[in-house]
């Protein structure tokens, strides 16, 4: 019996099977890719959902001991209707692409956490105005979209509002203003505002 009569080894047979496209090989690759994609997407979505919770937001003491305490005293936390807006409702866009962009930009906040930029109440207060202005700018740029997920000029019954509020809302619509133009500090203590243009 010569060498030519021997059956090829397992590795050679697998290599030949791999190199010779067949329906079975392509089907196997597609199945592996499909299952891998589902596993990746499921893990990615699970991670994103976990990172979009109030618990995640206050998991660092910088937030828990400062802005979260302020938020608990706000109408967004406790109100007559029982509807609560949590951190991601106001600070994370709902749409996929803007949400991903916001998550990437949040890496700067992670840098601040790691290197202790705002790890004491004094450091936090020293940076409060800059952090607030960054958030106000983001909200102004997206037309206060996170506010508008719950509040919308088009659906407001200004006749049911106090006269000063109705007047201001009507004027805001005429002037093309957005929520954050007037409602700064709605859920958190305002920073030293001497350098900031007043809302109303």
Swiss-Prot record:
Heme 2 binds at residues 87, 90-91, 188. The chain crosses the membrane at residues 24-44. Mediates electron flow from quinones to the NapAB complex. It is a single-pass membrane protein. Pfam families: Cytochrom_NNT (PF03264). Its main location: membrane. It is found in: Cell inner membrane. Keywords: Cell inner membrane, Cell membrane, Electron transport, Heme, Iron, Membrane, Metal-binding, Transmembrane, Transmembrane helix, Transport. GO terms for cellular component: plasma membrane. InterPro entries: Cytochrome_c-type_ET (IPR051174), Multihaem_cyt_sf (IPR036280), NapC/NirT/NrfH (IPR024717), NapC/NirT_cyt_c_N (IPR005126), NapC/NirT_cytc_sf (IPR038266), NO3Rdtase_cyt_c_NapC/NirT (IPR011885). Heme 1 binds at residues 57, 60, 63, 109. This is Cytochrome c-type protein NapC. Residues 45-200 are periplasmic.
């Amino acid at each position: 019996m010569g060498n030519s009569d021997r059956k090829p080894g397992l590795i050679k047979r697998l290599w030949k099977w791999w190199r010779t496209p067949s329906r079975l090989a392509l089907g196997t690759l597609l199945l592996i890719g499909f299952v891998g994609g589902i596993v990746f997407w499921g893990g990615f979505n699970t991670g994103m959902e976990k990172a979009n919770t109030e618990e995640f937001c206050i998991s660092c003491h910088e937030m828990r001991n400062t802005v979260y305490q302020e938020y608990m005293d706000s109408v967004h936390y406790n109100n007559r209707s029982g509807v609560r807006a949590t951190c991601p409702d106001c600070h994370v866009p709902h749409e996929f692409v803007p949400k991903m962009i916001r998550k990437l930009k949040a890496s700067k906040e992670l840098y601040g956490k790691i290197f202790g930029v705002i790890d004491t109440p004094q450091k936090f207060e020293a940076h409060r105005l800059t952090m607030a202005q960054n958030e106000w700018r983001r909200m102004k740029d997206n037309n206060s979209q996170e506010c508008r997920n719950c509040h919308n000029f088009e659906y407001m019954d200004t006749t049911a509002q106090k006269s000063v509020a109705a007047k201001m809302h009507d004027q805001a619509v005429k002037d093309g203003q957005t929520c954050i133009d007037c409602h700064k500090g709605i859920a958190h203590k305002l920073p030293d505002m001497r350098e900031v243009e007043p809302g109303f």
